[in-house]
A protein has these predicted regions:
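Surface loop/turn signatures of beta-propeller and other carbohydrate-active proteins
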Residues: 25-46, 59, 72-96, 122-141, ...
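Conserved Ser/Thr-centered positions that define the repeating blades of beta-propeller domains
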Residues: 69, 117-118, 159, 225-226
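A short loop-to-beta-strand structural motif that recurs across blades of beta-propeller domains
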Residues: 63-66, 112-116, 155, 219-221, ...
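Extracellular glycan-recognition regions
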Residues: 295-380
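Bacterial N-terminal signal peptides that target proteins for export
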Residues: 2-11
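C-terminal motif of bacterial Sec signal peptides marking the signal peptidase cleavage site
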Residues: 21-22
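Loop/turn-rich, solvent-exposed surfaces of beta-rich toroidal or solenoidal domains
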Residues: 188-244, 251, 374
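Hydrophobic core segments of beta-strands in well-ordered, beta-rich domains
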Residues: 34-35, 40-60, 79-82, 90-108, ...
Length: 380
């Protein structure tokens, strides 16, 4: 039995708890470019108070540079997950299952691979080839503990318990969200499935509209289901992220992943081009997300807020250190009969001073390179 004094104590404690909760400061909404330059197809994972991210690395090796952060804004490199390969790597997915870290990734050969590690700092395993087609893999653990890999066009493939092989054939379970026909896009192109569970719902976050078309092409679309395999219900607030006009600061916003922090704040991480600066590639951006009363994510601020640029800034001077396993993270290196050193431009304009010491009979040069069809420079 509760006497009068105990009841007053309980009620006072509840009142203090209610006031404390009401006065707890909310996190400042984020609307920030955290990786300026060409850091496309971001995938992000939270493990306690730590965040890990990697991006498409294409033809540059060592590949899949893994980054670490504790505040989602400032990032440090900690490992490269793939040492070498004869293919291009793009649109990976990083996840953690039963204490082990996984990165699933597709290649230009139409194949999907996975690498694993006990710690995100590595060492990472040799790539394991999966009998899974498609691109843009997205891993999910279902309510019964079974593992699945989603790929583009709404397909899902069951995996073995260790996540290292397909356990069945792909099945189409999602048709995407039909955006208005009058929108100017590159095509429908349902891709980039990223999945997570919140409460009783599984959420499927995808990209549509094409990533390199007109400024208004790309978008982030959300669907949900009580099952990891659907059926999927599209959000009435779609698209979560989209460029509506060529006048906006960022073009072709898309390829998003939703992530929370330990305090319960939610964010969407995605990529986009700077207005009229396709040459800088697709930067990685983060924005704050809030939840509606009926459990749909929406942006905290859709328009009007000033964009901030944090992340990878500072001195880009470089002295080659062959003993550094990361090869200084702002640079990539390749080895043939010589050495290729590359870095990503993050500014609208810049100056480059290069000093070479070349042995007799050798050659050196400096190039601006976007892809195999767009580059110029000089060597001698």
């Amino acid at each position: 039995m509760i006497n009068d004094m105990n009841l007053r104590t309980i009620l006072f404690s509840l009142a203090v708890a209610a006031v404390t909760a009401a006065c707890a400061p909310k996190a400042t909404p984020l609307k920030t470019c955290i990786f300026p330059g060409d850091y496309p197809d971001p995938t992000i994972l939270r493990d306690g108070n730590d965040f890990y991210m990697t991006h498409s690395s294409f033809t540059y090796f060592p590949a899949l540079l893994v980054w670490h952060s504790t505040d989602l804004v400032h990032w440090e490199p900690i490992a490269r997950a793939v040492e070498d390969g004869d293919y291009s790597i793009f649109a990976p997915d990083i996840c953690k299952v039963d204490g082990k870290f996984y990165i699933y990734y597709p290649t230009s050969k139409g194949e999907n691979y996975v690498v694993t590690a006990d710690r995100p700092e590595g060492p990472w395993s040799a790539p394991v080839k999966l009998d899974v087609g498609g691109i843009d893999p997205g891993h999910v653990v279902a309510e019964d503990g079974n593992r699945y890999l989603y790929t583009n066009n709404g397909f899902v493939t069951p995996l073995t318990p260790d996540g290292l092989a397909a356990a069945g054939r792909p099945k189409k379970v999602y048709d995407g969200w039909k955006f208005p026909e009058e929108w100017e896009t590159e095509g429908f192109w349902l891709e980039s499935p990223k999945l997570f569970k919140r409460g009783d719902w599984y959420y499927l976050v995808t990209a549509e509209g094409g990533t390199a078309g007109p400024p208004t092409s790309h978008m982030v679309v959300v669907a949900r289901s009580k099952s990891a395999l659907g059926p999927w219900e599209n959000s009435p607030h779609n698209p979560l992220v989209h460029t509506y006009s060529a006048d906006e600061f960022w073009w072709s916003k898309g390829h998003g992943t939703l992530i929370d922090d330990a305090a319960g704040n939610w964010y969407v991480v995605y990529h986009a081009y700077r207005n009229n600066y396709h040459t800088l590639g697709r930067s990685t951006i983060i924005e704050s997300v809030e939840w509606t009363a009926d459990d749909w994510p929406i942006l905290v601020e859709k328009d009007g807020a000033k964009w901030e640029q944090n992340g990878l800034q500072g001195d880009y001077s470089y002295l080659r250190d062959y003993d550094n396993p990361l090869l200084w993270a702002k640079w990539h290196a390749g080895f043939d009969d010589g050495t290729l050193m590359t870095t990503t431009a993050v500014d609208e304009s810049y100056e480059i001073t290069a000093k070479f010491s070349v042995p007799e009979g050798g050659k050196a040069g400096l190039y601006l390179f976007y892809n195999e069809e767009a580059y110029f420079g000089q060597a001698g």
